[in-house]
Amino acid sequence: MEETLERIQNAAGELGYTVPIVHDMQGNMARNGIEVLPAQIMELCHGARAYEILKSDKDRYNQAMLPCRVAVYEKEDGKTYVSWTNYAHFSQLEHGISMEVFRQVGSDYDEIMQGIVKE
């Protein structure tokens, strides 16, 4: 799992993304007395893409989608899995700047995950 997180961070970094934080969901749940399998949520931020949404009053409502996230988790079979929002699909629900930004993010995620995720 750690290797997968590192590979995602490295691939994302090559495209200009930073990782502001990784949430340890297993640890968070344990602090509440709940046991779950390992699960982490990595936040990815591309400053230039986020800026396009944040600078526009018309598009700022989409900041709830920022930063973009990737979940890396284990299942009972012991294998590591990765999931993320389909930003390319989400872009079809949008207009203007948000549509283009999320289309770009979707394309970036395809590139980031290539070679990391097996179909």
Predicted regions and their residues:
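Feature detects long, helix-prone N-terminal segments enriched in hydrophobes
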Residues: 1-119
